Amino acid sequence: MPSSKFNTPEKYRYNTGFGSYQESEAIENALPIGQNTPQRPAFGLYTEKISGSAFQAVRSENQQTWMYRIVPTVAHLPFEPEPSRQSDHGASNGDGEYPKGSVFQNLNNYRDLTYIPTQIRWDPFDIDTTSDWVHSMRLLCAAGDVSTKSGMGYFVFTAGRSMDAHTAFSSSDGELLVILQTGVLDIKTELGHLLVRPLEIAVIPRGIKYHVSLPAGPVRGYALELHQGVFTLPNLGPLGSFGCANARDFQVPVAAYDDPTDGETGESYRIVTKYNGHLFVASQDHSPFDVVAWHGSYFPYKYDLGRFMTVGSISYDHPDPSIFTLLASSEGLAEVAIFPPRWLVMENTFRPPWYHRNTMAEFMGLIQGEYDARVDGGFRPGGASLHNVMVGHGPDSATHARASDAELLPQKVGEGSMAFVIESNMLLGVSSWAWSKSGKRQLNYNAQTWLGLRSHFKKPQGVKENSPLLNPPRHNMNGKAPPN
Protein backbone atom coordinates (compact mmCIF):
# COMPACT_ATOMS: atom_id res chain seq x y z
CA MET A 1 0.00 0.00 0.00
CA PRO A 2 2.59 2.61 -1.08
CA SER A 3 -0.17 5.17 -1.75
CA SER A 4 -3.91 5.52 -1.41
CA LYS A 5 -6.40 5.19 -4.24
CA PHE A 6 -8.49 8.35 -4.44
CA ASN A 7 -11.85 8.90 -6.11
CA THR A 8 -10.91 12.52 -6.82
CA PRO A 9 -7.79 12.97 -8.97
CA GLU A 10 -5.04 15.35 -7.92
CA LYS A 11 -5.15 18.79 -9.59
CA TYR A 12 -2.09 20.55 -8.14
CA ARG A 13 1.66 20.03 -8.22
CA TYR A 14 3.76 20.13 -5.06
CA ASN A 15 7.23 20.28 -3.67
CA THR A 16 8.11 17.53 -1.19
CA GLY A 17 9.84 17.19 2.15
CA PHE A 18 9.15 17.57 5.87
CA GLY A 19 11.12 20.04 7.97
CA SER A 20 13.20 21.12 4.99
CA TYR A 21 13.86 24.57 3.58
CA GLN A 22 11.65 25.23 0.57
CA GLU A 23 11.39 27.88 -2.11
CA SER A 24 8.86 28.49 -4.86
CA GLU A 25 8.04 31.21 -7.35
CA ALA A 26 4.99 31.61 -9.58
CA ILE A 27 6.90 34.04 -11.81
CA GLU A 28 10.46 33.26 -12.73
CA ASN A 29 13.07 35.50 -11.05
CA ALA A 30 10.60 36.81 -8.45
CA LEU A 31 12.86 35.52 -5.64
CA PRO A 32 15.92 37.62 -4.77
CA ILE A 33 19.27 35.88 -4.97
CA GLY A 34 21.56 35.87 -1.95
CA GLN A 35 19.46 38.22 0.21
CA ASN A 36 15.99 38.54 1.71
CA THR A 37 15.15 42.26 1.70
CA PRO A 38 16.38 43.95 -1.47
CA GLN A 39 15.77 47.68 -1.70
CA ARG A 40 13.42 47.13 -4.61
CA PRO A 41 12.05 43.58 -4.91
CA ALA A 42 11.39 42.27 -8.40
CA PHE A 43 8.25 43.33 -10.28
CA GLY A 44 7.27 45.93 -7.67
CA LEU A 45 6.55 43.33 -4.98
CA TYR A 46 6.73 43.88 -1.22
CA THR A 47 8.87 41.81 1.13
CA GLU A 48 7.09 40.33 4.17
CA LYS A 49 8.28 37.79 6.72
CA ILE A 50 6.12 35.45 8.80
CA SER A 51 7.77 33.94 11.88
CA GLY A 52 6.51 30.74 13.46
CA SER A 53 9.20 30.62 16.15
CA ALA A 54 11.35 32.98 18.18
CA PHE A 55 14.16 34.62 16.22
CA GLN A 56 16.76 32.94 18.44
CA ALA A 57 15.27 29.45 18.30
CA VAL A 58 17.92 26.85 17.52
CA ARG A 59 18.41 26.38 13.82
CA SER A 60 16.70 22.97 13.69
CA GLU A 61 13.56 24.46 15.29
CA ASN A 62 13.58 27.88 13.63
CA GLN A 63 10.51 28.36 11.47
CA GLN A 64 10.11 31.39 9.26
CA THR A 65 9.23 32.22 5.66
CA TRP A 66 9.94 35.21 3.45
CA MET A 67 7.08 36.22 1.14
CA TYR A 68 7.20 38.46 -1.91
CA ARG A 69 3.69 39.74 -2.36
CA ILE A 70 1.69 42.35 -4.22
CA VAL A 71 0.35 44.18 -1.13
CA PRO A 72 1.49 43.64 2.49
CA THR A 73 -0.82 41.99 5.04
CA VAL A 74 -1.00 45.19 7.09
CA ALA A 75 -3.10 47.01 4.46
CA HIS A 76 -6.59 46.39 5.89
CA LEU A 77 -9.22 48.19 7.96
CA PRO A 78 -9.25 47.56 11.75
CA PHE A 79 -10.47 44.20 13.03
CA GLU A 80 -13.83 44.11 14.79
CA PRO A 81 -15.54 41.21 16.62
CA GLU A 82 -17.63 39.19 14.21
CA PRO A 83 -21.32 39.86 14.92
CA SER A 84 -23.38 36.94 16.17
CA ARG A 85 -25.92 37.14 13.34
CA GLN A 86 -24.51 36.01 10.01
CA SER A 87 -27.55 35.07 7.97
CA ASP A 88 -25.87 36.27 4.78
CA HIS A 89 -23.04 33.82 5.39
CA GLY A 90 -25.18 30.87 6.46
CA ALA A 91 -23.88 30.82 10.03
CA SER A 92 -27.09 31.71 11.80
CA ASN A 93 -29.44 28.98 12.99
CA GLY A 94 -32.45 31.18 12.29
CA ASP A 95 -32.74 33.01 15.60
CA GLY A 96 -29.61 35.12 15.30
CA GLU A 97 -27.29 32.77 17.19
CA TYR A 98 -24.35 30.72 16.07
CA PRO A 99 -24.74 26.92 16.08
CA LYS A 100 -24.27 25.55 19.58
CA GLY A 101 -20.76 24.37 20.29
CA SER A 102 -19.19 26.12 17.31
CA VAL A 103 -15.64 27.32 17.67
CA PHE A 104 -16.61 30.97 17.84
CA GLN A 105 -18.84 30.58 20.88
CA ASN A 106 -17.16 32.08 23.95
CA LEU A 107 -15.93 29.08 25.93
CA ASN A 108 -14.35 31.30 28.58
CA ASN A 109 -10.91 30.25 27.40
CA TYR A 110 -11.46 26.52 28.05
CA ARG A 111 -12.65 27.02 31.60
CA ASP A 112 -16.26 25.98 30.91
CA LEU A 113 -15.44 22.32 30.32
CA THR A 114 -16.47 19.07 32.01
CA TYR A 115 -13.70 16.90 33.44
CA ILE A 116 -14.92 13.37 34.17
CA PRO A 117 -13.04 10.03 34.44
CA THR A 118 -15.38 7.95 32.32
CA GLN A 119 -15.11 6.46 28.86
CA ILE A 120 -16.88 8.52 26.18
CA ARG A 121 -17.91 7.61 22.65
CA TRP A 122 -19.85 9.63 20.08
CA ASP A 123 -21.99 8.59 17.13
CA PRO A 124 -21.05 10.11 13.75
CA PHE A 125 -21.64 13.84 13.81
CA ASP A 126 -24.32 15.33 11.54
CA ILE A 127 -23.26 17.58 8.68
CA ASP A 128 -24.41 21.18 8.99
CA THR A 129 -25.44 21.98 5.43
CA THR A 130 -25.78 25.71 6.17
CA SER A 131 -22.25 26.31 7.46
CA ASP A 132 -18.94 26.92 5.75
CA TRP A 133 -15.53 25.72 6.99
CA VAL A 134 -15.08 28.37 9.67
CA HIS A 135 -18.58 28.23 11.07
CA SER A 136 -18.89 24.44 11.14
CA MET A 137 -16.09 23.87 13.67
CA ARG A 138 -17.31 22.42 16.99
CA LEU A 139 -15.11 22.01 20.03
CA LEU A 140 -15.20 18.48 21.47
CA CYS A 141 -12.55 18.66 24.18
CA ALA A 142 -9.56 20.76 25.17
CA ALA A 143 -6.91 21.59 27.74
CA GLY A 144 -4.75 24.58 28.49
CA ASP A 145 -5.09 28.30 27.89
CA VAL A 146 -5.14 29.83 24.42
CA SER A 147 -3.92 33.23 25.62
CA THR A 148 -0.73 31.76 27.09
CA LYS A 149 -0.12 29.48 24.11
CA SER A 150 -0.54 26.32 26.17
CA GLY A 151 -2.53 23.16 25.49
CA MET A 152 -4.69 22.20 22.55
CA GLY A 153 -8.25 21.95 21.26
CA TYR A 154 -9.94 18.98 19.55
CA PHE A 155 -12.64 19.81 17.00
CA VAL A 156 -15.03 18.18 14.58
CA PHE A 157 -16.01 19.99 11.39
CA THR A 158 -19.14 19.25 9.35
CA ALA A 159 -19.36 21.87 6.61
CA GLY A 160 -22.02 21.90 3.93
CA ARG A 161 -20.84 24.68 1.66
CA SER A 162 -17.75 26.48 0.42
CA MET A 163 -16.49 29.67 2.00
CA ASP A 164 -17.47 32.88 0.22
CA ALA A 165 -15.03 33.44 -2.64
CA HIS A 166 -13.81 36.73 -1.16
CA THR A 167 -13.28 35.46 2.39
CA ALA A 168 -10.05 34.24 3.96
CA PHE A 169 -9.52 32.67 7.37
CA SER A 170 -6.55 32.29 9.70
CA SER A 171 -6.01 31.33 13.32
CA SER A 172 -3.61 33.15 15.61
CA ASP A 173 -4.34 30.50 18.26
CA GLY A 174 -2.27 27.63 16.92
CA GLU A 175 -1.21 25.16 14.26
CA LEU A 176 -4.12 23.13 12.86
CA LEU A 177 -4.03 19.43 11.94
CA VAL A 178 -6.91 18.49 9.62
CA ILE A 179 -8.01 14.83 9.36
CA LEU A 180 -10.66 14.57 6.64
CA GLN A 181 -13.23 11.78 6.91
CA THR A 182 -15.57 12.43 3.98
CA GLY A 183 -15.74 14.89 1.09
CA VAL A 184 -12.91 16.90 -0.49
CA LEU A 185 -11.19 20.08 0.70
CA ASP A 186 -9.73 22.44 -1.89
CA ILE A 187 -7.57 24.69 0.30
CA LYS A 188 -6.15 27.89 -1.14
CA THR A 189 -3.41 29.28 1.12
CA GLU A 190 -1.14 32.29 0.92
CA LEU A 191 1.67 29.94 -0.12
CA GLY A 192 -0.26 27.85 -2.65
CA HIS A 193 -2.93 25.18 -3.01
CA LEU A 194 -3.64 21.88 -1.24
CA LEU A 195 -6.21 19.34 -2.41
CA VAL A 196 -7.12 17.16 0.59
CA ARG A 197 -9.09 13.94 0.22
CA PRO A 198 -10.09 11.18 2.67
CA LEU A 199 -6.93 9.28 3.71
CA GLU A 200 -4.96 12.52 3.51
CA ILE A 201 -4.17 14.90 6.35
CA ALA A 202 -3.15 18.55 6.17
CA VAL A 203 -1.43 20.96 8.55
CA ILE A 204 -2.03 24.72 8.43
CA PRO A 205 0.49 26.76 10.47
CA ARG A 206 -0.54 29.47 12.89
CA GLY A 207 -1.38 32.73 11.11
CA ILE A 208 -1.39 31.44 7.52
CA LYS A 209 -4.48 32.70 5.67
CA TYR A 210 -6.51 30.23 3.67
CA HIS A 211 -9.81 29.63 1.92
CA VAL A 212 -11.70 26.31 1.79
CA SER A 213 -14.02 25.25 -1.01
CA LEU A 214 -15.90 21.95 -1.21
CA PRO A 215 -15.75 20.64 -4.80
CA ALA A 216 -17.40 17.31 -3.92
CA GLY A 217 -20.10 18.62 -1.60
CA PRO A 218 -20.37 18.42 2.22
CA VAL A 219 -17.38 17.40 4.32
CA ARG A 220 -16.80 15.95 7.76
CA GLY A 221 -13.65 15.36 9.72
CA TYR A 222 -11.54 16.04 12.77
CA ALA A 223 -9.10 18.81 13.66
CA LEU A 224 -6.51 19.34 16.38
CA GLU A 225 -5.21 22.83 17.12
CA LEU A 226 -1.89 22.99 18.95
CA HIS A 227 -1.66 26.19 20.97
CA GLN A 228 1.99 25.54 21.79
CA GLY A 229 4.68 24.16 19.56
CA VAL A 230 4.36 22.65 16.10
CA PHE A 231 4.01 19.19 14.62
CA THR A 232 7.21 17.23 14.05
CA LEU A 233 8.21 13.76 12.93
CA PRO A 234 8.95 11.37 15.81
CA ASN A 235 12.46 10.06 16.35
CA LEU A 236 12.92 6.59 14.90
CA GLY A 237 15.38 5.18 17.43
CA PRO A 238 16.31 1.55 16.66
CA LEU A 239 14.24 1.65 13.45
CA GLY A 240 17.14 3.50 11.88
CA SER A 241 17.01 6.04 9.08
CA PHE A 242 13.50 5.52 7.71
CA GLY A 243 10.11 4.04 8.49
CA CYS A 244 6.65 5.14 9.68
CA ALA A 245 6.06 8.53 7.99
CA ASN A 246 9.00 9.36 5.75
CA ALA A 247 9.95 13.00 5.22
CA ARG A 248 9.98 12.74 1.43
CA ASP A 249 6.27 11.84 1.31
CA PHE A 250 5.00 15.15 2.72
CA GLN A 251 3.72 17.50 0.01
CA VAL A 252 4.19 21.27 0.12
CA PRO A 253 2.27 23.78 -2.02
CA VAL A 254 3.99 25.76 -4.74
CA ALA A 255 3.53 29.51 -5.10
CA ALA A 256 0.28 30.67 -6.69
CA TYR A 257 -1.36 34.09 -6.59
CA ASP A 258 -4.50 35.99 -7.55
CA ASP A 259 -3.62 38.24 -10.49
CA PRO A 260 -4.77 41.83 -9.74
CA THR A 261 -4.96 42.56 -13.46
CA ASP A 262 -7.91 40.19 -13.95
CA GLY A 263 -10.46 42.91 -13.25
CA GLU A 264 -11.05 42.26 -9.53
CA THR A 265 -8.84 45.09 -8.23
CA GLY A 266 -10.70 47.20 -5.70
CA GLU A 267 -13.21 44.51 -4.72
CA SER A 268 -13.67 43.96 -1.00
CA TYR A 269 -12.21 40.92 0.75
CA ARG A 270 -13.32 39.69 4.15
CA ILE A 271 -10.51 38.58 6.48
CA VAL A 272 -11.65 36.40 9.40
CA THR A 273 -9.19 35.65 12.20
CA LYS A 274 -9.58 33.42 15.26
CA TYR A 275 -7.89 35.19 18.14
CA ASN A 276 -7.99 33.82 21.69
CA GLY A 277 -11.00 31.71 20.79
CA HIS A 278 -13.03 34.55 19.26
CA LEU A 279 -13.61 35.52 15.64
CA PHE A 280 -12.65 38.96 14.36
CA VAL A 281 -13.29 40.42 10.91
CA ALA A 282 -11.56 43.05 8.81
CA SER A 283 -11.99 44.14 5.20
CA GLN A 284 -9.48 45.08 2.54
CA ASP A 285 -9.56 46.05 -1.12
CA HIS A 286 -7.18 43.39 -2.43
CA SER A 287 -6.81 39.63 -2.38
CA PRO A 288 -4.85 38.16 0.55
CA PHE A 289 -3.68 35.43 -1.83
CA ASP A 290 -1.12 37.58 -3.62
CA VAL A 291 2.20 35.92 -2.73
CA VAL A 292 4.11 35.60 -6.01
CA ALA A 293 7.15 33.87 -4.50
CA TRP A 294 8.36 32.61 -1.14
CA HIS A 295 11.17 30.76 0.58
CA GLY A 296 11.48 29.39 4.10
CA SER A 297 10.63 26.65 6.57
CA TYR A 298 7.15 27.74 7.71
CA PHE A 299 4.47 26.44 5.36
CA PRO A 300 1.36 24.22 5.10
CA TYR A 301 1.64 20.64 3.93
CA LYS A 302 -0.34 17.45 3.38
CA TYR A 303 0.37 13.71 3.66
CA ASP A 304 -1.16 10.57 2.15
CA LEU A 305 -1.77 8.06 4.97
CA GLY A 306 -1.36 5.22 2.48
CA ARG A 307 2.37 5.98 2.34
CA PHE A 308 2.85 5.17 6.03
CA MET A 309 5.33 2.31 6.48
CA THR A 310 3.88 0.14 9.24
CA VAL A 311 6.17 -1.86 11.52
CA GLY A 312 5.26 -4.52 14.06
CA SER A 313 6.29 -7.66 15.90
CA ILE A 314 7.40 -10.65 13.83
CA SER A 315 7.82 -12.94 16.84
CA TYR A 316 5.50 -12.47 19.83
CA ASP A 317 3.53 -9.85 21.82
CA HIS A 318 1.78 -6.68 20.69
CA PRO A 319 4.28 -3.76 20.87
CA ASP A 320 3.43 -0.36 22.32
CA PRO A 321 1.24 1.65 19.90
CA SER A 322 4.03 4.22 19.55
CA ILE A 323 5.17 2.14 16.56
CA PHE A 324 2.22 3.68 14.68
CA THR A 325 3.16 7.31 15.43
CA LEU A 326 2.71 9.60 12.43
CA LEU A 327 3.34 13.02 13.99
CA ALA A 328 4.47 14.31 17.37
CA SER A 329 4.52 17.81 18.82
CA SER A 330 7.68 19.78 19.46
CA GLU A 331 6.62 20.43 23.07
CA GLY A 332 5.80 16.79 23.88
CA LEU A 333 2.15 17.77 24.07
CA ALA A 334 0.54 15.31 21.67
CA GLU A 335 1.27 12.33 19.43
CA VAL A 336 -0.79 11.30 16.41
CA ALA A 337 -0.85 7.61 15.45
CA ILE A 338 -2.74 5.77 12.71
CA PHE A 339 -3.80 2.14 12.33
CA PRO A 340 -3.54 1.24 8.64
CA PRO A 341 -3.93 -2.19 7.03
CA ARG A 342 -1.19 -4.49 8.33
CA TRP A 343 -0.17 -8.10 8.89
CA LEU A 344 -0.33 -9.79 12.29
CA VAL A 345 1.97 -12.80 12.68
CA MET A 346 2.78 -12.93 16.41
CA GLU A 347 2.85 -16.41 17.96
CA ASN A 348 1.17 -17.35 21.26
CA THR A 349 -0.10 -13.78 21.53
CA PHE A 350 -3.35 -11.96 22.20
CA ARG A 351 -3.12 -9.91 19.03
CA PRO A 352 -5.54 -6.99 19.59
CA PRO A 353 -4.38 -4.08 21.78
CA TRP A 354 -4.23 -5.05 25.42
CA TYR A 355 -6.35 -3.57 28.22
CA HIS A 356 -4.76 -0.37 29.31
CA ARG A 357 -4.68 2.65 31.59
CA ASN A 358 -2.50 5.48 30.40
CA THR A 359 -0.99 8.71 31.68
CA MET A 360 -1.92 10.06 28.24
CA ALA A 361 -5.47 10.98 27.21
CA GLU A 362 -6.48 9.06 24.08
CA PHE A 363 -8.85 10.57 21.50
CA MET A 364 -9.79 8.23 18.64
CA GLY A 365 -11.54 8.74 15.34
CA LEU A 366 -12.38 6.50 12.40
CA ILE A 367 -11.92 7.62 8.80
CA GLN A 368 -13.28 4.51 7.12
CA GLY A 369 -13.99 0.83 7.72
CA GLU A 370 -14.03 -0.87 11.12
CA TYR A 371 -11.39 -0.68 13.84
CA ASP A 372 -10.08 -4.19 14.54
CA ALA A 373 -10.42 -3.88 18.34
CA ARG A 374 -14.11 -2.90 18.12
CA VAL A 375 -16.71 -5.22 16.62
CA ASP A 376 -19.76 -4.04 18.57
CA GLY A 377 -20.76 -1.64 15.79
CA GLY A 378 -20.68 1.46 17.98
CA PHE A 379 -17.42 2.95 16.70
CA ARG A 380 -18.25 4.23 13.24
CA PRO A 381 -16.65 6.51 10.63
CA GLY A 382 -17.27 10.13 11.54
CA GLY A 383 -17.69 9.32 15.23
CA ALA A 384 -15.09 9.48 17.99
CA SER A 385 -14.12 8.27 21.44
CA LEU A 386 -12.23 9.73 24.39
CA HIS A 387 -10.43 7.69 27.04
CA ASN A 388 -9.00 10.30 29.36
CA VAL A 389 -5.94 10.12 31.61
CA MET A 390 -5.84 6.83 33.58
CA VAL A 391 -9.29 5.77 32.33
CA GLY A 392 -9.40 2.03 31.57
CA HIS A 393 -10.04 0.91 28.01
CA GLY A 394 -9.30 -1.91 25.60
CA PRO A 395 -10.96 -4.42 23.27
CA ASP A 396 -14.69 -4.97 23.58
CA SER A 397 -15.88 -8.24 25.08
CA ALA A 398 -16.64 -9.82 21.69
CA THR A 399 -13.17 -9.00 20.39
CA HIS A 400 -11.57 -10.47 23.51
CA ALA A 401 -13.52 -13.71 23.16
CA ARG A 402 -12.73 -14.03 19.48
CA ALA A 403 -9.01 -13.23 19.80
CA SER A 404 -8.55 -15.52 22.80
CA ASP A 405 -9.63 -18.56 20.79
CA ALA A 406 -8.44 -17.58 17.30
CA GLU A 407 -6.12 -19.81 15.32
CA LEU A 408 -2.88 -17.84 15.12
CA LEU A 409 -2.24 -17.90 11.40
CA PRO A 410 -0.74 -14.90 9.58
CA GLN A 411 -3.63 -12.45 9.34
CA LYS A 412 -4.17 -9.23 7.38
CA VAL A 413 -6.23 -6.77 9.44
CA GLY A 414 -7.57 -3.33 8.69
CA GLU A 415 -8.30 -3.85 5.00
CA GLY A 416 -10.43 -0.90 3.90
CA SER A 417 -10.04 0.68 7.33
CA MET A 418 -8.18 3.64 8.80
CA ALA A 419 -8.43 4.67 12.44
CA PHE A 420 -6.32 7.20 14.30
CA VAL A 421 -5.54 8.13 17.89
CA ILE A 422 -4.26 11.42 19.30
CA GLU A 423 -2.53 11.01 22.64
CA SER A 424 -2.01 13.98 24.94
CA ASN A 425 -0.27 14.30 28.29
CA MET A 426 -2.98 16.69 29.53
CA LEU A 427 -6.34 16.05 31.21
CA LEU A 428 -8.96 16.85 28.59
CA GLY A 429 -12.15 18.68 29.46
CA VAL A 430 -15.27 18.01 27.36
CA SER A 431 -17.37 20.85 25.94
CA SER A 432 -21.05 21.09 26.82
CA TRP A 433 -21.91 20.57 23.17
CA ALA A 434 -19.95 17.31 23.03
CA TRP A 435 -21.25 16.13 26.42
CA SER A 436 -24.96 16.72 25.91
CA LYS A 437 -26.13 19.32 23.40
CA SER A 438 -24.97 17.46 20.29
CA GLY A 439 -27.03 14.41 21.26
CA LYS A 440 -24.25 12.18 19.92
CA ARG A 441 -22.70 10.83 23.13
CA GLN A 442 -23.48 7.11 23.50
CA LEU A 443 -24.99 6.69 26.95
CA ASN A 444 -24.62 2.88 26.80
CA TYR A 445 -20.96 2.86 25.72
CA ASN A 446 -19.62 1.06 28.79
CA ALA A 447 -22.45 -1.49 28.93
CA GLN A 448 -22.26 -2.27 25.24
CA THR A 449 -18.48 -2.55 25.16
CA TRP A 450 -17.13 -3.97 28.41
CA LEU A 451 -19.84 -5.12 30.83
CA GLY A 452 -19.93 -8.40 28.93
CA LEU A 453 -16.48 -9.23 30.25
CA ARG A 454 -16.66 -12.04 32.84
CA SER A 455 -14.20 -13.62 35.20
CA HIS A 456 -12.53 -16.76 33.85
CA PHE A 457 -10.28 -17.18 36.86
CA LYS A 458 -9.84 -20.77 38.10
CA LYS A 459 -7.88 -21.17 41.28
CA PRO A 460 -5.32 -23.95 40.81
CA GLN A 461 -5.36 -26.90 43.16
CA GLY A 462 -2.28 -28.05 45.04
CA VAL A 463 -0.23 -24.95 44.22
CA LYS A 464 1.47 -22.97 46.96
CA GLU A 465 0.12 -19.46 47.51
CA ASN A 466 2.61 -16.74 48.46
CA SER A 467 1.41 -14.48 51.27
CA PRO A 468 2.22 -10.74 51.29
CA LEU A 469 2.72 -10.97 55.07
CA LEU A 470 6.18 -11.23 56.62
CA ASN A 471 4.87 -13.79 59.12
CA PRO A 472 1.90 -15.50 57.51
CA PRO A 473 -0.28 -17.77 59.67
CA ARG A 474 0.52 -21.45 59.47
CA HIS A 475 -2.09 -23.62 57.76
CA ASN A 476 -3.12 -27.19 58.57
CA MET A 477 -3.53 -29.95 56.02
CA ASN A 478 -7.01 -28.66 55.10
CA GLY A 479 -5.58 -25.29 54.09
CA LYS A 480 -7.16 -23.57 57.09
CA ALA A 481 -5.33 -21.49 59.67
CA PRO A 482 -5.26 -23.10 63.14
CA PRO A 483 -7.56 -21.51 65.73
CA ASN A 484 -6.05 -18.91 68.05
Predicted features and spans:
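Jelly-roll (double-stranded beta-helix
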Residues: 1-484
